[in-house]
Amino acid sequence: EYLQEKKVPFVTIGSSNYTGVIQIDHNHKSACKELTSIILMKGMKRIALIGGDENHVVTQSRLRGFREAYEKMGEVIDPTMLFLNLDNHVVIDKIVEEVLERKAECILCMDDAVCSRVLKKLREKHVKVPKDIRVASFYNSSVLENNVPSITSLSFDAKELGMVACKTVLDVIEGAEVETRTLLPY
């Protein structure tokens, strides 16, 4: 708000609920819809979704994609397999145990940090991925890239995000018309 009041040119990297703010982000909703659809097409029905703060715009976008995939595939989400607002390792560990008791076929993690913790807990319990349970993530990072076995995850190009944001803010400074929201591919 301060930057807008002072007419300082800026863009946000990531999505925001602020109106009139130029946003550059990846298309999280579409990416998560596609990954969830693929998992459903592989015949998995008992999918647990584990994630963080649902007040975050990125979590909301990813959740919309997840829901849209179920709708597109004509499937019904089991609300007892949705676990959001998990904010610490202890809670995530407890949820992993609960998901295993509920015989989930796949754990779908909202991001790499959650996924990393899920994998650690599965290793501690001697649960084999993908033999005993499948694991996928809505966000990839170096944390997951080196995991053995590899984890199916969505990759977003952070370098491209920065370059597009830089070009956009330069265009704003030069007075050019720019889109208020730019969604990049995955």
Over which residues does each language-model region extend?
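Bacterial carbohydrate/catabolite-sensing allosteric modules
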Residues: 4-186
